[in-house]
Swiss-Prot record:
Keywords: Coiled coil, Nucleus, Phosphoprotein, Plant defense, Repeat. The keyword Nucleus applies. A motif (Nuclear localization signal 1) lies at residues 190-197. A motif (Nuclear localization signal 2) lies at residues 349-356. One of its GO terms (cellular component) is nucleus. The gene is EML4. This is Protein EMSY-LIKE 4. The lineage of its organism: Eukaryota, Viridiplantae, Streptophyta, Embryophyta, Tracheophyta. PROSITE patterns: ENT. InterPro entries: EMSY-LIKE_plant (IPR033485), ENT_dom (IPR005491), ENT_dom-like_sf (IPR036142). The modification Phosphoserine is found at S419. Residues 23-34 have a biased composition (Gly residues).
């Protein structure tokens, strides 16, 4: 049989691409090939590359979260180192939302405390400058302690005595952390001159331009008027050694005391909020977080035992000046800083408040102030409910509860005093 000649060249060049056999005998270098010309199997390095990319993205996201968290910490530190319950609540929620551990929190907090900008702000505060605004001064006061509840019946206001403002000679910057040893309550009103304020004395309203206008009374340098806080930079070197019988002076912060003033021979409640280790003085705040708030810097050891009453345990501080009395140890200096609230009188919430010790027999009004218990309970529950509670928050919660206990004991004692006084009056009648 005759064989017809084939037009084919005898190779697979005439076959379709999908039927061609790769040269080199067997499979090609890239492995098996699909009909579309792509390899059926990806190289083993491809999944690893995708995992590395995902891990890198996660790291970048967490870095952004840490930057956001440290920015909030820096902002709070710039406002003031006394952290309120509200700010701590914000910080706790941020740590949850941004997935930050306690170790990362401590690391970032350490970076904030060592930040050059924050350090300059602290030095500015310590150097004796004023707060940038009234809002910041109010924030520091509220951060120290929650606002106490005050009986509305005691808020009887007296007419204020207008006093012309005097320009402040110079201003210097200020700030600091935690318990600011300088004066944290100074506000924009600190640019004014001295504002004399006398407790327990009634004043007639004096109008500007009146011929009967009296000049501000002169007060000797060793006894400035009630309700004023003198300049943090005294004109003479102040001794920083205050005998506290081996007790840490900062342990008095948050304690409540009652001090007697010679103007009306009456005791007034105050809270110890700050300590200045340079001068050895503590800040006493009266009517805290109210329009009539006043404060002063004193050396507790120099107050006569008969002029101070401790609510709770008495630390037994010695009196170096043999009972010379309250008012001899206040900070002196050429420039006065009026209290927050544009110089309202200290006795605006205590009009008519008298004790039976001067023999007048007038009724003594009850003045009890304690923290809002429901707010306090909520904050303590928030600390206890957290998964890993911060030891600092737990310690602070314990301290606040102890202070609240002291306040309740003092309130019960006041109720007992009032009840005894009323019973004695009824017996005399």
């Amino acid at each position: 049989m005759d064989c017809k000649s084939s037009d084919s060249s005898g190779t697979d060049d005439d076959l379709p691409p999908s039927h061609r056999v790769p040269r080199g005998g067997g499979g090609g270098r890239g492995g098996r090939v699909a009909g579309n010309g792509r390899p059926l199997n990806l190289p083993p390095s491809y999944p690893k590359m995708y995992d590395d990319l995902a891990a890198d993205m996660e790291a970048q996201i967490h870095q952004i979260e840490k930057e956001a968290y440290i920015s909030v910490l820096r902002a709070f530190k710039a406002q003031g180192d006394a952290i309120s319950w509200e700010k701590e609540s914000v910080i706790t929620e941020l740590r949850k939302e941004l997935s930050l551990s306690n170790e990362e929190h401590r690391e970032l907090l350490g970076r904030v405390n060592s930040d050059d900008t924050i350090r300059r702000i602290r030095e500015w505060r310590q150097s004796g400058g004023m707060q940038p605004s009234m809002r910041n001064a109010a924030q520091v006061v509220h951060d120290t302690l929650p606002s106490p509840s005050v009986s509305a019946s005691m808020k009887t206001h007296k007419p204020n005595q207008p006093i012309p403002s005097q320009p402040f000679a110079s201003s210097s910057p200020s700030f600091h952390p935690q318990a600011d040893p300088t004066h944290p309550f100074a506000s924009s009103t600190a640019k004014r001159g001295p504002v004399p304020i006398v407790k327990g004395k009634k004043h007639k309203p004096v109008f500007p331009g009146s011929s009967s206008t009296k000049h501000a009374p002169y007060h000797p340098s060793d006894q400035p008027p009630r309700g004023q806080v003198m300049n943090r930079l005294p004109s003479v070197p102040a001794s920083s050694s205050e005998p506290t019988n081996g007790i840490d002076p900062e342990s008095f912060l948050g304690r409540r005391v009652r001090t007697k003033w010679p103007e009306d021979n009456t005791f007034y409640d105050a809270i110890i909020t700050q300590y200045n280790p340079v001068e050895g003085r503590h800040a006493l705040v009266y009517d805290i977080a109210t329009p009539s708030e006043t404060w002063e810097w004193v050396r507790l050891s120099e107050i006569s035992p008969g002029d101070i009453e401790w609510i709770g345990e008495d630390p037994g501080l010695g009196n170096r000046y043999n009972g010379q009395g309250h008012g001899l140890n206040r900070t002196t200096g050429p420039n006065c800083v009026p209290q927050r609230g544009s110089g309202l009188e200290k006795n605006t919430i205590r009009k008519g408040f008298r004790t039976s010790q001067n023999g007048t027999g007038k009724k003594k009004h009850l003045d009890i102030r304690i923290r809002q218990t429901d707010v306090l309970i909520r904050e303590v529950e928030r600390v206890l409910r957290s998964h890993n509670p911060d030891p600092y928050e737990v310690e602070r919660a314990k301290r606040v509860l102890e202070e609240h206990e002291h306040a309740l004991v003092g309130a019960i004692a006041k109720l007992g005093d009032i009840s005894d006084g009323e019973n004695e009056g009824a017996f005399r009648r």
